[in-house]
Curated annotation (Swiss-Prot):
Keyword Signal: yes
EC number(s) stated in the UniProt entry for this protein: 3.1.3.62, 3.1.3.80
Glycan attachment points: 242, 481
PROSITE patterns per UniProt: ER_TARGET
Subcellular localization: Endoplasmic reticulum lumen; Secreted; Cell membrane
Tissue: Widely expressed with highest levels in kidney, liver, cerebellum and placenta.
Protein name: Multiple inositol polyphosphate phosphatase 1
Matches recorded under SUPFAM superfamilies: Phosphoglycerate mutase-like (SSF53254)
Disorder cited: Thyroid cancer, non-medullary, 2: A form of non-medullary thyroid cancer (NMTC), a cancer characterized by tumors originating from the thyroid follicular cells. NMTCs represent approximately 95% of all cases of thyroid cancer and are classified into papillary, follicular, Hurthle cell, and anaplastic neoplasms.
Swiss-Prot/TrEMBL keywords: Cell membrane, Disease variant, Endoplasmic reticulum, Glycoprotein, Hydrolase, Membrane, Secreted, Signal
Amino acid sequence: MLRAPGCLLRTSVAPAAALAAALLSSLARCSLLEPRDPVASSLSPYFGTKTRYEDVNPVLLSGPEAPWRDPELLEGTCTPVQLVALIRHGTRYPTVKQIRKLRQLHGLLQARGSRDGGASSTGSRDLGAALADWPLWYADWMDGQLVEKGRQDMRQLALRLASLFPALFSRENYGRLRLITSSKHRCMDSSAAFLQGLWQHYHPGLPPPDVADMEFGPPTVNDKLMRFFDHCEKFLTEVEKNATALYHVEAFKTGPEMQNILKKVAATLQVPVNDLNADLIQVAFFTCSFDLAIKGVKSPWCDVFDIDDAKVLEYLNDLKQYWKRGYGYTINSRSSCTLFQDIFQHLDKAVEQKQRSQPISSPVILQFGHAETLLPLLSLMGYFKDKEPLTAYNYKKQMHRKFRSGLIVPYASNLIFVLYHCENAKTPKEQFRVQMLLNEKVLPLAYSQETVSFYEDLKNHYKDILQSCQTSEECELARANSTSDEL
């Protein structure tokens, strides 16, 4: 990967008087980030849901389009006959809410600079002054939209999957692809970029046409599947709109770990600690991640934090995901039953068609959603569950927790079900097997740690969800005259 000379700035060795000028000029010089940048890579594992996909799969840093085959993938007499993938959108801009918080923080730094001229007690320029001068290039119109890096995420994922499963992604099967997407533009644009990646696979060297001009046509929008949480009244009332549902998130913000960071950042930026809060600290940390993910530059915002700070801020993010999308409340995962059942309906149909020696009508189903789509589903299936809940008070005990959102659902994260037909099976049960991949790596079964399952056994394990979990009932609010167990 190319790197501009002097791209990596070390504020500790740069002449203090020239620090601000150096930081400003670096933006123009650093268009790509060295994969092993020591400062950026030291914080990268802790960005939570704002994590780059390649930081979860470091092999992609050197060859993002080269297929990587997990040695646990089945081969030989077992042939993949269907692939069902749930894919999070690619890298995106911050939301308008995050942009406005960053603008607020930037304004605090500029106001401080206008009072004291940006000089420290030694008369030199400090980090706060340099950040005040750092270009704030985020604008409200960006509001969570997919960036070019996000389109690249999708094109490259398409190329890798097509190379990994050539029979399923054959040119003959192109017209039988099924694409479903959330109505959010970042998901629709991700699906379009994925299709362009497939075009590149089929027609190397030729520029892809617009998706509307492809023989496949645009994907189907289905928010009841991809944004099931928006259609679950119980979730909306008891979690989304409940001021106390994220108690542990708010308690951690005022706890000792976050308060220590608050004081440290206030001292570093030379602003009154009362002018800062946990939300502003978090948006500063995320700005480091956005600059890295979107532009590939090492932002001076990264210099505000060290690894210990990053671990605390990651936990704050994980607390929110845990209580709002994971194991915190049962309805978080149960609201995804319809999506889980839909996946198995596709697999059932493929099994039935194969048993009848019919062609598989939908060999590849691609569904584009959000981190909020994937996390509840993985929780429903029993993945990444810790022995104790994540709370505001057990940060140190959870240092080695399983539930780390950045490792589970980075940008472009994907959960893939692969159905195999095995020719030399001794019994009908052994004919069909399933493997799951998370972020292109084989995901051991949550209940056995095996890397492959007979399809019938997998269905039996999840029988309760497949047969008894009815979203209409799960999401129905208790009637007003019924007994409530709320405190």
